[in-house]
Structures are given as C-alpha cells and as structure tokens.
C-alpha cells in the first residue's frame, strides 16, 4: 500500500516556499513570521525516525524534534524527487521529477536524475516548474543555493 499524505500536512515542498513568503512579509504554511533572510540546511536521508534512533549522537538536532517540527518528505522519497519538491515548492506529480532513473525518450536511454546529466539533456524539459530561487530572483530578491 502506498503511503497517504496527512490531510493538511506539511511537506518539504512547504519549506523554501514558506521562507520566500516570510521574506516577502506574507503568511505561509509553516507559520514563519516576517523575516529578512533565511538559511535552510537539508541533511539528505535524515528523517525523524533516523534522528530519534541516533538522538545521542545528534543531541542538538534531536532536542529540537517535536511532533510539530516533523514534516513529510513526500512520495516517492528519492533524493531527486525530494530536492525538486524542496526547491520548487511543488509535489513530485507537479514538478515532474519522480525518481532516480527515468526514460529519456528523445535519446532512447535511461538516465539517472542525480548523476546522468550530459550535454544531451535539457533540465528545463525535466523540471516543469520554476524553482523558489528563480521566483525570488524575479521578485528582485537575492537567492543562492550551495
């Protein structure tokens, strides 16, 4: 059985989207107050259950863990889908990146979304939505990803 999202639950798609809204002084799904800047740190593969299981090794992070601070990764829980959700503010069915390996029908091959990029692939044809960074820049706000 596939996992079902919680009704009105928060997901990775809400994180940067809420940061941008807070910087613009707008309401947002995370309930962030108006801010001037935001820094988001994502530790790939570090879900709430893994953090609970290793709480003794990550006391600062695990100490901040509450039921309200846990958000859904989305589905599927691959890095490609999750990072695209984080950076576009959209769920995988909307942004189009749903797994690691996908068919590149234009070149009749299977490519890896994380490491298989070459000159024959155009990112704009795979990621169907603009990123939060692109929208921030279009609004005249500085934005960067490291």
State where each predicted segment sits:
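Active-site nucleophile/metal-coordination loop of metallo-enzymes that catalyze phosphate/sulfate
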Residues: 1-38, 45-133
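Feature for exported/extracytoplasmic and membrane-associated proteins, marking the mature portion
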Residues: 127-146
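Structural beta-sheet core signal
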Residues: 40-41, 145
